[in-house]
Amino acid sequence: MADKRDNKGELRWHQRIALELLWGICLLFSRTPEWLRFGLLQSFIRLVLRLLRYRRKVILKNLRCSFPEKNEAEIRSIMLAYYDTLAEVIVDTLCLAGATPERDGVLLEWENYQEHIEANRGRDWIAMASHYGFWEYYPLWSWLDKDALFMGVYHPLRSPVFEHLYRRLRNLAPNIHQVAMADTLRFYMRHRSKERTTVLGLISDQSPALRADTVWFDFLNQKTAFIEGSERLALKFSIPIYFVEAERLKPGRYRARFKQIYDGVEQVEPKEITRRYAEALEAMVRRQPELWMWSHNRWKHTPEKQREWYGASTDDAQA
């Protein structure tokens, strides 16, 4: 499923209608002024999330386990602030429709982007991002480096309608190709070129499938499994890796920078690059915890479950 550019032939007629209705709604919201987006609309969505107590038990459990040093009032304050973030993410997603550099170039400010482009001119590199702030803004990088091929690696959605909708929302530029995670290596091997830089963008903080060789790191006070795909690619092809560090300036406005965690040539121990990513992510989450995706059941797998299923555990990767 490597970037079929919104091939509606895969959908039934009623799914096509649903897709176009949703796209029309997104286009409508994308043309609203900021005071309406982040005033009335975001406030309404935030109210709905709070009234529905959206994934409240999961959020509170994750926060309590991650920050045992915080009291209950502080935990609940972060939860309410997270609902604000989630409402903003929904608004920002709706408003991605029809995005252009002229209209939306100010949404994400990249620090030292020109120096970064020059430093990696003619060299492929990996951007390891996370579900922090509004991660759907990160492909806006493609507007700054128009000569590069941007691979947006993602997990396909179960709903074909929303799969097509999100692919359309993310097609922000001709040099963006959305690649299903299972097709990453195949697509990269087919399209890598000495004539052009290829940027692999990966959201790397999801919970991986539990396997016998799943490795654990100390992260936010808990044993946590991490996806190792970026590290394997980097070591196989000698590609540098950059952690995407972000901060929110105000609703709908972010600043991001690239922090190198592997230069493509350093001799490192197994799992070391993934460990550096986990450490950088934890430091960022602790600075503004309300910006991370706490409603995801991130710790559904444990070393104990690994031992139960496979008879052994690679507990903590000797971290």
Labelled PLM ranges:
Residues 17-20, 55, 180, 272-276:
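Soluble or luminal CAZymes and related metallo-dependent hydrolases
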